[in-house]
């Protein structure tokens, strides 16, 4: 909402003959005594203007021209802050626009004509999805939803790690269990995949082929069968929490020779070598990151001839640039912290604009019950499984709990709290606010003939009580919260904001009688409730949680 102040302040600077490259900063004070909005522009410019900041602030205020009925007063505070106090009339007139825009409230055309790719989950198809991957999946999905509100042409991509040593180990693990199922005595390697799901895949192969594969040297049938079954399972798990991708990029394509006889991986090595950043020693091929100030060079091809993760990752990101996206967002787990800077350095060396690539790294997840760490799985190996978490707490709680803390913070997922039907549970608290409004509107329609068609929305201008104005003012923050969440790649900002909306609404509901108020005030408060419901619904859509109409 502060956007309406910006042109007025800039015009005042022009009228005062002040030219500056410094951006005008407008903030929302935490203490309402300091206004609805505040700017420190006079403090920022006092030195270069050689003026006392309070005197400069007074001059700028004298040059400010606002439309009638928008700003109640302007004050100079402290060393030179300019504080703006809006009129209740202007706030409530602005709330009317929420009702007019409906589902589109908070959306913009900032990304119109631009394309963005968000890569998230990208788990190896070597086992069921873990809770840690689930957190990254929800984070990425919410970031994609945020970008969608700004009009970007969006690609939601899953990088399918179907090459490399881990896939070989998967195939070997299934073959060992298959041989065991055929009655052969084996010693199962500790380094291989231990989960019960490996036995289940082996059983499928046994039912189809009986013992005919027991002496087969063809590892592919074991690996490919496991890969197909596991990846199908991964997709089903993600769908349970409404995560779907529209693009899947297979890692193995980076190893396939193209028309010139070179693979994408080969091309990376050639390009980096042409820039003087490749050397070969100790039997391996190295990325000379010491030339970039790092302590050690990084292996791109091991002495065994197998590429390290860095080489195909660089090739994959070069492909993203080849596809000419305007914005590239990667959502990684904390295990990528050491690796992705090398990918960025390689892209810079090869002449690509890395400012268009942004990385969101989410920290680890621990599940707890009564403060004690627990494992979600006792059956399928030593892992916390996402499916079992969803079974236990449901899809909505799974999604919201994953993003209610900053991605930069370790998350303690409190299982008991996620199942509580009380205001202590943030999912329940948010959804209860929405359900309460729906119930109120049903009763109002039955008892007072209220119709949410907008014909009485102008009566919002009659509202002047503090809980009403504060709720309306909070609703007007929604578009800015979206922009902030995108800028920080932090959907948690949306969770915090919606919690504030719910909190403000519950206060308004308790302190301002609605159904028993005079007809005009009743109608106005119902429309304020309707606007609140719209903001909650729009926010729930971004977060990917349901909006129940009764609880």
Swiss-Prot record:
Catalytic reaction annotation: tRNA(Arg) + L-arginine + ATP = L-arginyl-tRNA(Arg) + AMP + diphosphate
A GO biological-process term: arginyl-tRNA aminoacylation
Keywords of this entry: Aminoacyl-tRNA synthetase, ATP-binding, Cytoplasm, Ligase, Nucleotide-binding, Protein biosynthesis
Single GO MF descriptor: arginine-tRNA ligase activity
Chief location: cytoplasm
HAMAP family: Arg_tRNA_synth
Family from the record: Belongs to the class-I aminoacyl-tRNA synthetase family.
Protein name (Swiss-Prot/TrEMBL): Arginine--tRNA ligase
